[in-house]
Amino acid sequence: MDEYLKTLLEQIRCKKARPYVKQEFQDHIEDQIEANMQAGMDREQAEREAVRDMGDPVETGISLDSVHRPQVAWKLLGIIVLISIAGVLIHAGIAGKISENAAAGSDRYVFHVVIGLAVMMILYLLDYTVLARFSKIIAVILLFACLVTLLGGYQLNGARYFIVLPGGRGISMQTLMLFYVPIYGAILYKYHGWGYKGLMRAIIWMLAPLILVYTMPALMTACVMLVSMLVMLTIAIQKNWFTVRKKKAICGIWAGFLAMPVAAFLIRYLSSSLTEYQIARLQAIFSGGGEKDSFTGMLHSFWQQNKWIGKSGSDVMGNLPAFNADYILTYLSSVYGTIAVILLCCVLAVLIFAVFNTAMRQKNQLGMMMGCGCGIVFLINIFINILENLGIFPQSVTFLPFLSAGGSCIIVSYGLMGIVLSTYRYKNIYPRHLKIGFKFDKTKAKKALYVSKMSMCIWTGGTVVVMCVAIYWDLCKSYMNIPFKIVTIVLTLLLVGNMRKIVQYNETNR
């Protein structure tokens, strides 16, 4: 049997598929051996007959090699190329018509698309199971970056959205946090087979980014993330990832999370903690008057003046803010006609269908969940952006994936698509379920324990030093410097993490 499996696996070029193919054939041969032994054969004869029934290993291996190999989603790539070309032409036209300041983002659209394509290819070639293996670490990094943005990010209109990089370029943290959604899918998969304890941990991983993003405040992004992760959690419960009562769990989670925003608003309203600007916005939304109504009226007038084909007489570029970003559809309808916008929306609809079709046809449950997460983010953003352009949805911070100006929006869109392409690439390689935890090599146990002890000592000393410096700073400046607080918290968490690893190691090696 070993010689047969060795010859068969030599024909399969994809090394990632070999362990799963070997396990599948080995189990099949073992079952056949058991059946032959029950028929009266001895072990050696039963194994020989079972291997003979499997056929020629070379021919079988070659046929398996044609199936178990990386795949390319040519249809998805074709749609992405089409949308990218359309975006380049649109923003090249915008940048050529008006000044650099007025066309902020359009003049750098090609540069951002190139970076986005590079990110997409990196994530496409990178196995999505690698992201899943380090999903909790990636999630913590995103949460930490969001916290840093809240404490020391660039402030714009009373909100802290951006981390300013050297050279004056900024990263929109509220947009970057959309990467958390597919990562959350991998975190959900790590609790596969758990009960209510795992479900509560999954909810905690959902709440953490929502609180930080809402505090920015980026209400629209928080709502997009909330709905996306709730749908993913619902899918996980429905597919029996958690050993819980499905109907009660799903109804309880949705009821709780839908009631939370209402409760939060009532608390802030009754405690008079809402700002005058927020009160004015709410009054405008519910009463149909004020600044919001005039803006919506302007959008309606633009659409009423549009032609089916060709340019209208509306001065969209001069009157509409963010016409090349949030309201790109309104601009396109005024310049190229309503038919052009309808065709573009149809292309985006085909893209969304292709993404969900790719995700739902995944045999591997991890790839299915991560792909669905990306598709949900695309769907919600496109849907809200269309409604906002039509004046149906209140004015908010949105973007049209792949087409709105803004480096962060473009790069995040291509990055999410890279994850979808990666799940398709390995769809015929991985089985239905995977083990994505860290592998522990027992031969290196002593060295790992020594390193853990040394790191614990280093982090302990570092924590003490930082706390002493912070106390000294507090005495000198009469306040605690926020960066020292952050460093102290991080060092303490790392210290606790190392101590936990040592305890786990001692428990498993008694």
Q: Which functions belong to the PLM regions below?
A:
Residues 359-397, 403:
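Loop-to-helix entry and N-terminal half of a specific, functionally important transmembrane alpha helix
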Residues 48-157, 205-206, 355, 375, ...:
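A structural signal for hydrophobic alpha-helical transmembrane segments in multi-pass membrane proteins
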Residues 194, 392, 398-471, 489-510:
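A juxtamembrane structural motif centered on a specific transmembrane helix
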Residues 105-134, 171, 177-193, 231-241, ...:
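Transmembrane alpha-helical segments and their membrane-water interfaces
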Residues 111-119, 334-355:
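Hydrophobic alpha-helical transmembrane segments
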